[in-house]
């Protein structure tokens, strides 16, 4: 069987892997994803409004062993894993590998391998993954670009795997503070937007002036993941229709036993409810069946005849 697949034959993952970096509010936004488990490397829970932690399960990481143990537990009740922050996670890996001393050049191979193990293990869970990062800067000529605070090699290795990279910031417009996130790369921030989200999205204020919640914290669930899953569902429906027509074609090809039945198949090939490349696939399947039967194809009449 060929390993080459048409677009309608692909297995499309339904999980989103993203990173959020920037100014205040990153953790709260990350926890707006569906059924999150928070891996708190940064001791950030102490800085969060407790209303945002209601019904949120948290692992307060004290050593890298904590991470290794929790990833062996049954995490089936969670839909999202939040890593807060990925930079601090790297610090735990360095401590795990080097203790209290500074890492040497020889240490970085093991450190990078452990970092890769972590990202692979998270991906294998088949859940939404959200990395939270602090903000750093990078000079590009005269421009200063905001980037996630993460060692360059680690950043370069993980950004290729992300579906989304979002920069969160506060903006003041006519005296009103607005929190926005952009996933588009710009001259002032890194970004990645494979889900075709709007260029700039406003993150709603969910607390009143007294710190009491005014609405549900569900920005990522409703504004990012839900539209993405709707798009995937549309693709899945197309794929199911494609699989259905291929099943019908396969059933009809089982009846092809000679040139007459092969030519009858050709005459009715347009009767199938074709999706995408299914008509081309049907022609290829017929050609394979005809070869198996030893039929001869006439290129001029585009019909088959039985072998002499």
Q: Where are the language model's segments positioned?
A:
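Conserved P-loop
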Residues: 2, 7-76
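P-loop/Walker A phosphate-binding loop and immediately adjacent motor/lid segment at beta-alpha junctions
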Residues: 2-14, 50-62, 66-67, 174-235
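Interfaces that engage single-stranded nucleic acids at replication/repair/recombination sites
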Residues: 5-8, 24-26, 33, 211-308
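Hydrophobic/aromatic ligand-binding patch that stacks against planar heteroaromatic rings
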Residues: 27-30, 121, 157-158
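Short, structured coil segments at secondary-structure junctions
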Residues: 32-34, 125, 161
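Long, charged N-terminal accessory/stalk domains
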Residues: 76-80, 88
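P-loop NTPase motor core
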Residues: 85-156
């Amino acid at each position: 069987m060929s390993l080459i697949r048409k677009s309608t034959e692909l297995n499309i993952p339904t999980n989103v892997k993203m990173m959020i970096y920037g100014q205040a509010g990153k953790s709260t936004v990350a926890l707006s994803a569906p059924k999150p488990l928070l891996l708190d490397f940064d001791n950030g829970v102490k800085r969060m409004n407790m209303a945002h932690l209601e019904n949120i399960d948290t692992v307060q990481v004290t050593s890298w062993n904590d991470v290794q143990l929790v990833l062996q537990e049954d995490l089936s009740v969670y839909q999202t894993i939040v890593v807060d922050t990925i930079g601090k996670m790297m610090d735990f890996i360095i401590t795990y590998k080097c203790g209290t001393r500074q890492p040497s050049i020889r240490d970085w191979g093991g450190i990078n391998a452990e970092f890769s193990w972590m990202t692979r293990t998270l991906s294998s869970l088949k859940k939404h993954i959200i990395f939270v990062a602090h903000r750093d800067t990078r000079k590009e000529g005269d421009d200063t670009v905001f980037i996630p605070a993460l060692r360059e090699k680690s950043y370069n290795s993980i950004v290729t795997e992300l579906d989304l990279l979002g920069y969160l910031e506060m903006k003041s417009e006519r005296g009103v503070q607005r929190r926005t996130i952009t996933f588009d790369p710009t001259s002032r921030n890194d970004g990645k937007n494979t889900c075709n989200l709007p260029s700039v999205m406003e993150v709603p204020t969910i607390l009143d002036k007294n710190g009491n919640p005014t609405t549900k914290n569900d920005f990522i669930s409703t504004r990012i993941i839900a539209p993405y899953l709707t798009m995937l569902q549309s693709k899945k429906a197309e794929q199911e229709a494609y699989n259905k027509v291929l099943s019908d074609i396969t059933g009809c090809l089982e009846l092809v036993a000679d040139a007459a039945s092969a030519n009858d198949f050709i005459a009715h090939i347009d009767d199938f409810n074709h999706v995408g490349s299914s008509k081309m696939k049907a022609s290829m399947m017929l050609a394979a069946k005809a070869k198996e039967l030893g039929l001869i194809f006439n290129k001029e009449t585009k019909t088959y005849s039985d072998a002499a």
